[in-house]
Amino acid sequence: MWQVSGAHGAIDPVRAVDAMLAYHDAGFFTWDLADHYGPAEDLIGDFRRRFAASRGAERLSEIQAFTKWVPYPGRMTRRTVEDAISVSRRRMGVDRLDLLQFHWWDYSDRGYLDALRHLADLRDEGQIRHLALTNFDTERLRIIADHGIRVVSNQVQYSLIDRRPDARMAAFCGDHKITLLAYGTLLGGLLSEKYFGRPEPQRSELNTASLQKYKNMIDAWGGWKLFQELLTVVNGIAEKHQVSIANVGVRYVVDRPAVAGVIVGARLGIAQHLADNARTFGFALDEADFQLIEAVLVKSRDLMTVIGDCGDEYR
């Protein structure tokens, strides 16, 4: 639900919840959001109320809403942490958060360990079901594990062009029973038929924050010419399986070791891709597909060297 935070088109709350109901009816039950994604947590609250009224309160357990807490730098007291979690629970209309994903801006400030200890206490007390992370690197995962703090997942950027989790993180997560939730898998929409065969777009043509962000990632990875080479290969694979380019991109990542799910953005009330998204689960990539993809990817730059580990682009 990052798209409701701004720079992706105006969101009408009623139409947005209409779209959320349609997604649920199509079998998409889990939402990813954050405390700072504009009205995202409030929309979850509205969605739950309308869902209970129209589908029955007894079915509310079908809905999963994975939110995030992204605190400002400062001292992490029990009061600070609990107050923030209480705000999210109130906005979302729940007694307990399904999954709380914690983000921290500055690793030199070890206050993230204090915050996580308090969050773990709140989990044990029943205010949070599962504790998780977002955009933490492998070294910080190790430190957190060494301090005995149990987390179930880490949300990181993971796509055909950004395979940094493969370098260190996936193996660490496998050893410590931590899963990965992947975002950025469709590069904000650039990994699609719309951009296949197109000249390199000017920045003024990229009309959402996501398109601008992931065009920068493509530039760091290898540039537009190599990206078109990748799209050519992926389009051929998509035609072979009678699916879309986006389906191939998601299938590739969801099958990676340690990946528990892929987050696909939705411009609620503006653009929906219900039927196309569902096709992701109706086919499998074969060894020939992987070889064709790898033949292009080996020509790219190593983003671990260019950017650093997962999440380093935010620090």
Residue ranges of predicted features:
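Terminal-tail/helix-coil boundary detector
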Residues: D175-T179, P201-G236, K240, D255-G261, ...
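Aromatic-lined glycan-binding groove of carbohydrate-active enzymes
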Residues: P165-S210, S244
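A short, structured active-site edge motif that brings together acidic residues
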Residues: R59-P73, L100-H103
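Glycine/proline-rich, positively charged
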Residues: I11, L21, D25, G74-A167, ...
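Generic structural signal for well-ordered alpha-helices
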Residues: M20, E41, G45-R48, E82-R89, ...
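Conserved, mostly hydrophobic/aromatic
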Residues: Y23, W31, I44, A65, ...
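N-terminal binding-site loop/beta-alpha segment at the start of enzyme catalytic domains
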Residues: M1-I63
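Short helix-capping segments at alpha-helix termini
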Residues: R50-S61, M92-G93, L122-Q127, D146-R150, ...
